[in-house]
From Swiss-Prot:
One of its GO terms (biological process) is translation. One of its GO terms (molecular function) is structural constituent of ribosome. Belongs to the universal ribosomal protein uL30 family. It comes from the Bacteria. Keywords: Ribonucleoprotein, Ribosomal protein. The keyword Zinc-finger does not apply. This is Large ribosomal subunit protein uL30. The keyword Cytoplasm does not apply. Pfam families: Ribosomal_L30. It comes from Borreliella burgdorferi (strain ATCC 35210 / DSM 4680 / CIP 102532 / B31).
Length: 71
């Protein structure tokens, strides 16, 4: 999770978001945020440009995702 925080602190980069935890039993708010990011089930991956709105969404669901920087 610490690596996720370092990546979120950067600006104007592309990040790959990987869903590693299930949506079952999670708060409805977190489920909606993950679906807005395009992550519906475990193992889904999406690439997003890291701006302020995406940063807020990633911070909301930081414990359920893994981030990696895409060149």
């Amino acid at each position: 999770m610490e690596n996720n925080r370092k990546i979120i602190s950067k600006n104007n980069i592309n990040v790959q978001v990987f869903l590693v935890r299930s949506l079952i039993g999670k708060l409805n708010k977190k489920v909606k945020v993950l679906k807005a990011l395009g992550l519906n089930k475990i193992g889904d991956k999406k690439v997003h440009f890291l701006n302020e709105s995406i940063k807020g969404m990633l911070n909301e669901t930081i414990n359920m995702i893994l981030l990696s920087e895409v060149m």
